[in-house]
Amino acid sequence: MTHEHHAAKTLGIGKAIAVLTSGGDAQGMNAAVRAVVRVGIYTGARVFFVHEGYQGLVDGGDNIREATWESVSMMLQLGGTVIGSARCKDFREREGRLRAAHNLVKRGITNLCVIGGDGSLTGADTFRSEWSDLLSDLQKSGKITAEEATKSSYLNIVGLVGSIDNDFCGTDMTIGTDSALHRIIEIVDAITTTAQSHQRTFVLEVMGRHCGYLALVTSLSCGADWVFIPECPPDDDWEEHLCRRLSETRNRGSRLNIIIVAEGAIDKNGKPITSEDIKNLVVKRLGYDTRVTVLGHVQRGGTPSAFDRILGSRMGVEAVMALLEGTPDTPACVVSLSGNQAVRLPLMECVQVTKDVTRAMDERRFDEALKLRGRSFMNNWEVYKLLAHVRPPKSKSGSHTVAVMNVGAPAAGMNAAVRSTVRIGLIQGNRMLVVHDGFEGLAKGQIEEAGWSYVGGWTGQGGSKLGTKRTLPKKSFEQISANITKFNIQGLVIIGGFEAYTGGLELMEGRKQYDELCIPFVVIPATVSNNVPGSDFSVGADTALNTICMTCDRIKQSAAGTKRRVFIIETMGGYCGYLATMAGLAAGADAAYIFEDPFTIRDLQVNVEHLVQKMKTTVKRGLVLRNEKCNENYTTDFIFNLYSEEGKGIFDSRKNVLGHMQQGGSPTPFDRNFATKMGAKAMNWMSGKIKESYRNGRIFANSPDSGCVLGMRKRALVFQPVTELKEQTDFEHRIPKEQWWLKLRPILKILAKYEIDLDTSEHAHLEHISRKRSGEANV
């Protein structure tokens, strides 16, 4: 750790930070405000709320109030922005900015954290560039003294992007996007059930005037027939194509059609395509019963998803650090997420690229607009086009046979992965088989061929429709080899948890004895525990996280009513503390006990003492998470008994074991989208590998790189040979030896008011957006 960073606790002494939310609200803004306030106070700085956005900055007075630790309590689970946001005309005029500068100087505030969309952030940059002129004007007119001017000689600005459209270039995800997707998907799922009853076509209009992100991801997450987005207008004969597509879907036996339209959708000539236009077209040409639903402001509402709370919190921490480390020479920056890395980017570069996209669309340079949106957006578009617009070939000549299976415990999103694997496989012209009940089913021959409609409507369904078991293959190699020959299986896609990975290792071992096992296979990590080596995320973990989070919210609410109550909640995850840690961040827990971060009786004592102190404040409730296997002796009951005894007369304790609800439920948008893209990526790899492994008329794959885990690493999806991942695995505890999320634990402790050192050595350095374009998360 570098020495200048070591003093995070004193970094803010003598400094003041103001935080404001501006422009359209977005879920997760409160999480960011809470983190800015608490981390600011932790560093020794004074933190001020600016109410009503820039308007409050201009009007001053009671709009700018000092924040306390407790004033941001219970904010985490609220949607919108608690400190208010307003569109502000005054700040656009220099006169307004002069008043704003005066209000800041008088309070000694030289650090401004702006949470909003690109308009709000551009405004902040203008304000910063004029700062010294504004000060000299104020000094000339006698509004501020020379001494005040010197004290506030420069203004630091850091932006956080809060916008449900995800329309800001340079950030993979803006605060609020994931929550907006949650709202949309809840509605799409509800509409799907009624559409199926009546065989209807639904046209859904989602927000996004200049950006089609929400529409695009929604269509991937619900398997829509068609999506209209501003960046990619349809071809000139789109009416023909759309109607043909809808009737094909119907003829395959589907009872519903879903068409997603972004509010800014246009055709190649820039003429708007409205949801009514589409409805009229379908009714006129096909005579289908068609309904339009415009989602509107529902998308901005509701509680933030777990992802947005963690994103808001992490960005808030990073923003405070960027402000306090700022000098007159550092450009105004935005803090954002790339893959799962926090990055700082020059604010104006991002604004420029964001404007370039709009200009490219205005000038009908649509290919360029798509490129500027970044690689992740383009990947979404490619997968959508494949799944929605390519017809599977009629003949299976020269095709290969690939089998898909689920292994391990059920996880939400497994079905979405199976669906995209099967459909992409069919589009490539392969024969696709599905295996029921994991390796056991492969041994018993529970295998059948899957056609296009076999997996219809699977994206939104939780659990595992194929059936899944933890059984490993080793003891049934004889039968498995026989079935590989019998069904002519030439490639295997294994979707599952830690057993899918260890099963893969066993298959590699078995190749020495059984030639039949020399076929390419790929493991797609799918488990709520997120403990598969070689991947930062696994399918199903996001859904489980949201389930835990929702439960914790309800429990906290009940505790807020009874007061002086501490809840101890046990989460799943085996030995892996991912769920407990991330849910702790997202639900605002006081502590999260996990196996990877060993704790002693002294730590438990410190936690109890901490809660005793907390009961003296206005926040009279506590939330403690415990991973199921964090310690064999300090069980949930033990911790509950300890807290009950030590808290006598000060607080009551209650315990909850969440259990299997964490494996159930409908998959979240993230898990649907992630699973869909992983399935597509796995099949593209598979068809290449099978062709490579063709020897004398049969498949023979014997190299280490023909058995891989497909994982998300930092910013890209990568294939890693299972044998190479052995070194990185702790087999006894079924977890990877290195886990990226452990470095988020200090944030959890600081936000819960513990005096600890924040290791800021892993800080994001300023990057440039052009470089980022090529290295972006390739998901």
Swiss-Prot record:
Domain of life: Eukaryota
Pathway terms, separated by semicolons: Carbohydrate degradation; glycolysis; D-glyceraldehyde 3-phosphate and glycerone phosphate from D-glucose: step 3/4
SUPFAM superfamilies referenced in this protein's UniProt entry, alphabetically: Phosphofructokinase (SSF53784)
Glycosylation site positions: S529
Active-site feature positions: D165
Cross-referenced PROSITE patterns: PHOSPHOFRUCTOKINASE (PS00433)
Modification type Phosphoserine: residues: S132, S376, S666, S774
CC annotations in GO: 6-phosphofructokinase complex; membrane
Regulation acting on activity, per entry: Allosterically activated by ADP, AMP, or fructose 2,6-bisphosphate, and allosterically inhibited by ATP or citrate.
Xref: CDD domains: Eukaryotic_PFK
Quaternary structure note: Homo- and heterotetramers. Phosphofructokinase (PFK) enzyme functions as a tetramer composed of different combinations of 3 types of subunits, called PFKM (M), PFKL (L) and PFKP (P). The composition of the PFK tetramer differs according to the tissue type it is present in. The kinetic and regulatory properties of the tetrameric enzyme are dependent on the subunit composition, hence can vary across tissues. Interacts (via C-terminus) with HK1 (via N-terminal spermatogenic cell-specific region).
Name this protein carries in UniProt: ATP-dependent 6-phosphofructokinase, muscle type
